Amino acid sequence: MLNKLNLNKLFFIAITLSIFTLEAQESSDESADSMEEVITTARRTEESVSDVPIAISAFSGTDLDEKGITNMEDIRSLVPNMLIQKSAGNQSVAYVSVRGMGSQRGSVQYDNKIAIYVDDAFMIRPQGSLFDLFDVNNLQVLKGPQGTLFGKNTTSGAILVNNNLPVVGEFDSSVKVSMGQRNLNSIAAMVNVPLTSNAALRFVGITKKQDGYINNLDGFADDGGIIDNETFRAMLSVDITEDLNLLYTYSMFDSAGTPVYANCEVYTNSNMLSGGPAINVLTNGMKTRAVESC
């Protein structure tokens, strides 16, 4: 009798565990089906990321918003084997490397090894590549040589940024306000305005300001690391026919912040007069006054 009761208990426990396993599997399947599918243009045509035979990291605009990505520099936290560094001499210049290959040159005479495309427009030089992000449709990072479809400057890969296009026949708007440490203040706004039954305008504006984190001791210049960015984008879309669309885009990014100095320590120089600011002579002959990290 005792053995029979034990067998009944084991049978009941086995059935219960099976039911829980089935419910968990169904819940997991429903969650997978509800995931947002990201469409990529890595092969110059719209495809699902899962169908593209390329090492790619792709994110929708919703993904970027949920992860707090507001600037090109932030995407380094999302993409494996990718490094984005801000130039010490220019707040808007990015040094990008993928799989250990990239460029550490920020001058206008040097080409990148990783191409950046914004709405299919190639950014020729690294200046202005650390722009702010808002109202983005998707962002894609292609790893490995991409010269066949994207031409030169793609030895290590390519970054594709596709913004939301104007929507015909629909008025829409959105505003995002951000505040943070070092007096961070950021306002981003978007307005979509329908003009006619086949034309629409879309405006995006971003302003971002933040105090620097490097104190300048001599008092004759601003602190290092100040962020003062302004972004404006206007897009006009006209559906000429069902198969022909005219898209005009004007984009402006202004970065008036102060650079992060090459060295952030206090230097003393016995050749300087007592009480005078220390001078650090850099390897390229440039000079910077003494600064102190906060």
Show where each model-derived region lies.
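Cleavable N-terminal targeting peptides that direct proteins into the secretory/outer-membrane pathway or into
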Residues: M1-S31
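Outer-membrane beta-barrel domain signature, strongest for Gram-negative TonB-dependent receptors
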Residues: A221, I227-C294
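Acidic, small-polar-rich N-terminal luminal/periplasmic segments of exported/outer-membrane proteins
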Residues: S31-V168
